[in-house]
Amino acid sequence: MARLQAAAVVEAIPRDWFEEYVRALLDRAEDLRTDEEGRIQGDEELADVALVEGDHLTAGARYQRHTDPPEGEDGNGTTSELLITSWERTREVSAAVTTWHPDDQKTTWTVKLSDPGAPGSLVAGGEHHAAKRLHRLSWAARLDIRQWWRQVEGGGGQAPVTVLLRHHYGQARLLVRAAAEGGGKWRLGLTLVVRGRGWVRPLAAVGLLFVRSKLEAELREAVAEIAENWNADIPELLKHDPRDAGIWVSDLRRDREELDRWLAENG
């Protein structure tokens, strides 16, 4: 087992701005409409998404999107399906996403936002399914939003962010703690615990002794790069009204598809 540490100071997001931003994101989704064939109307980047089952933005609503690769025969692309499992603005919004890739690979995601009006927590998880065990992955992440605000307002307690990545031969667990830094900034403390699993565990324990310093240096470099990008983007974002700013549904979908594609290409 190796325990790696990193830290960063990042621009803070005001709580009221964030909560209004989330409400605006959900409002925008609800403003979208479907035509007679189920195609999404109101956002050109979602024009290739169709409602194939159920009523728009209600539990059981099922949406699909089909793509073909830049080269290759038609029908050799991916199919993505989003299933709304809950849409109750006063309690919970949740969905499940499945993407079928060529070569019999599949990526599944679940996401759940509790108390959307004043967000309480965001939980996400998923799996990448592949024929070879070596290429299978699963992950789970939780952001306890209320605990985050408590920590940046001077409280203690458990880490508000936890991420678990699991492979047949190893796993990594990330914990993120937050504190107010002053001057409109947050100080983040990150702990990454890496270990082997199964018969690999004793071998990994020995190997990690030799590469721990290198892994920690790479972690700190990655965290510094992410913090630098965050600190460049967030001040610009905060100049806007939260109902006009931001990352909307199409941007979130594009980010998830890029990650799914990376998993498939490396699976």
Describe the function of each predicted region.
Residues 12, 58, 104, 134, ...:
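Alpha-helical structural elements
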Residues 19, 31, 35, 95, ...:
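Broad hydrophobic/π-residue packing in well-ordered secondary structure
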Residues 204-260:
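A conserved amphipathic terminal alpha-helix motif
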Residues 1-131:
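Hydrophobic ligand-binding cavity/cleft-lining segments
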Residues 183, 194, 234-244, 264-267:
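Long alpha-helical, hydrophobic tracts
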Residues 1-7, 252-267:
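Actinobacteria-biased recognition of intrinsically disordered, low-complexity terminal regions
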Residues 97-216:
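Beta-strand/loop substructures that line and gate deep hydrophobic ligand-binding cavities in soluble
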